[in-house]
């Protein structure tokens, strides 16, 4: 800083040591007065990029039709699962329906995450997670906007807002339609809420989801998946879904919805018959989520005498198909040896 010095007709700017020291003190004071609330912005992580799925957790697939083991279903959630018939997906209006937000953690694909800034202020407006062929895209709004009314229309992707907690992005999704928790086995209602935590550790991204549903769940259901950054990633191919005639009976009877009436699901005892899992365990519930549930089963579980499914041996070759043994020579044909050699 300078001081003006006037001598006769001349004017000089003279630097004063006292002023420089004062300026240094003012600067130091300003640094100490910076609000602590502004500091977490430096800790916010960059989540953008292509992320490949790395985890080997339960991906939501089930070999048995009725497999609610480990799911905290309520009585209504169990009734919904037992009434469901997967043939309903062959109805024209259901063939192209998408999975709910939980599919981000249970689906087979990776993530493509990008950010959206205000074009003038460059302030972060939202994080965007691209959709797949059977999952809607997710926009995580970071500008503080409120969630819509509970009466607002619901979509497959829902409405999501986010905030930073330290270096973790916490996102809450509401207003999504009823959909699968475990693919084609159990379901979440349109009153469910999904809370995500995105935490980055170098080139690894841990995503934890907590699903809460007052209708079909008796307790929150927790899912976790790990993704790894792929610096050479490319976009996910999105293909159009076109309904076709899969089951003629459904197209001949447009109002028909395949289902099971109470007590009529013929697959209810499948896990018990194939794997020896007691029926009360196969029907799920909060207790089946926890390791100590093994103590409940130890007196009732009996290992099947012989393996019935997933026995570790390759399936038999189809008769006459690829991999089938060559046909035996035809006696007196004269060409049998040649045909067998081929």
List each model region and its residues.
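Bacterial N-terminal signal peptides
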Residues: 26-38
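N-terminal start and proteolytic maturation junction detector
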Residues: 3-5, 38, 44
């Amino acid at each position: 800083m300078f001081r003006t010095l006037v001598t006769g007709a001349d004017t000089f700017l003279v630097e004063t040591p006292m002023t420089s020291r004062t300026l240094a003190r003012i600067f130091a004071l300003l640094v100490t007065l910076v609000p602590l609330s502004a500091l977490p912005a430096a800790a916010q992580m960059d989540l953008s990029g292509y992320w490949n799925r790395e985890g080997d957790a339960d991906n939501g697939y089930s070999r048995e039709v009725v497999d609610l083991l480990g799911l905290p279903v309520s009585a209504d959630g169990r009734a919904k699962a037992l009434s469901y018939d997967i043939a309903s997906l062959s109805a024209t209006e259901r063939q192209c329906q998408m999975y709910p937000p939980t599919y981000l953690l249970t689906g087979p694909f990776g993530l493509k995450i990008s950010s959206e800034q205000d074009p003038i202020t460059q302030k972060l407006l939202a994080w965007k997670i691209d959709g797949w062929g059977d999952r809607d895209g997710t926009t995580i709004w970071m500008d503080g906007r409120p969630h819509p009314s509970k009466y607002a229309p619901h979509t497959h992707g829902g409405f999501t807002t986010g905030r930073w907690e330290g270096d973790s992005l916490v996102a809450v999704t509401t207003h999504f339609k009823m959909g699968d928790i475990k693919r084609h086995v159990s379901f979440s209602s349109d009153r469910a809420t999904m809370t995500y935590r995105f935490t980055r550790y170098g080139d690894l991204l841990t995503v934890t989801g907590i699903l809460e549903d007052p209708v079909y769940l008796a307790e929150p259901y927790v899912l976790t998946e790990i993704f790894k950054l792929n610096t050479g990633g490319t976009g996910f191919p999105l293909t159009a879904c076109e309904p076709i005639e899969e089951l003629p009976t459904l197209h001949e009877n447009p109002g028909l919805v395949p289902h099971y009436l109470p007590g009529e699901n013929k697959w209810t005892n499948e896990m018990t018959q194939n794997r020896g899992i007691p029926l009360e365990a196969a029907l799920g519930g909060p207790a089946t989520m926890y390791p100590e549930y093994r103590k409940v089963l130890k007196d009732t579980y009996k290992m099947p005498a012989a393996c019935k499914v997933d026995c570790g041996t390759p399936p038999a070759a189809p008769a006459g198909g690829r991999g089938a043994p060559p046909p035996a020579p035809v006696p007196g044909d004269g060409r049998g040896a040649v045909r067998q050699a081929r």
